[in-house]
Amino acid sequence: MYAEITFPLHAQRGAAYLTAPNIPARHAFSTRLGGVSTGVLESLNLSVRRGDTPENVRENWRRLGAAAGLDLTRAVYAKQVHSADVRIAHAADAQPPEHEPRFTCDGFVTNEPDVTLAVFMADCLPALLHDPAAGVIGAVHCGWRGSVADILGAAVAQMCALGAHPED
């Protein structure tokens, strides 16, 4: 028997996003609803790699962040390569979203409360991990290659290095 979980849709401030009710840490799953991008990208496009202008991408990230209560104008994100590599993220790693990513990996963990972690999905799965007792969070891009290579195990190990306990 599977538990049914509903992901509420929130639409405000020019963007729409989903949340998971069983994750107490502030988070958002973006949608394509809202935004200022035009033409074939007409939506809440979050990537300059699709041919959108940096200004549109920056504004779309700003709108999503304003709607979700997150500072997405500076986030930690990576060039995702379907690996099992998970990095510990720090505030100094954050950068504007229209810049090329500094890191090549498929997940981040942090224990710094003001660090926003971002991972991108297409046909892969996101995993958000949270140890509320230790104040450690993780965001992981789970493609099939990374899943086979145990990216979630790597994320839990990195979280444990920051003081998390899997049972929490």
Where does each model-flagged region fall?
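Surface-exposed, charge/polar-rich loops and edge strands
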Residues: 2-5, 13, 114-116, 124, ...
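Residue-level recognition of the N-termini of beta-strands and the immediately preceding loop/turn
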Residues: 25-26, 73-76, 166-168
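Conserved nucleotide-ligand handling architecture
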Residues: 1-29, 33-34, 39
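Generic structural signal for well-ordered, non-membrane alpha-helical segments
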Residues: 23, 53-61, 148, 152
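Glycine-/proline-rich flexible loop or hinge segments
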Residues: 39-52
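Short amphipathic alpha-helical segments enriched in hydrophobics
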Residues: 29, 34-37, 65-68, 72, ...
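Short acidic/glycine-rich loop or secondary-structure boundary segments that cap or lie
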Residues: 38-39, 86-87, 146-149
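Phosphate-centric recognition/catalysis
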Residues: 54, 58-142
